[in-house]
Amino acid sequence: MFVAMTIHSHRYVVEKSTAGMPLTDAVKLGKEVWERHSCINCHTLHGEGAYFAPEVGNVMTRWGVLDDPEGAFEILDAWMKAQPSGTPGRRQMPHFEITEEEMRGLADFLRWADQTDTQNWPPNDAG
């Protein structure tokens, strides 16, 4: 029974993967950046994490750069460099020292997360 369940699970993961984009070294680097800077302490990713800052599981779709790796990097880089914005009455994102390679990885990680089939979860399209 154990062997049969193991084979079934392996086939399901291989054939029914929810990822719409390959898991590249850049995506892995981006996940490491996400974890190192504890982004989930403020943001949610597919509904998991804190609710202080916007959901980022669909941020690349909202920004219109899901299929544009260079555009995703450029908009994320500009956004992160503009923080904190200093807008009165608004929550402030801290400024992070992130290399260009790490920023590209983070952009790829967020594009990868955005292409994951979450079966419409979370149900909110907004961030």
Regions found by a protein language model. Name each.
Residues 1-25, 79, 109-127:
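Post-cleavage N-terminal segment of exported redox proteins
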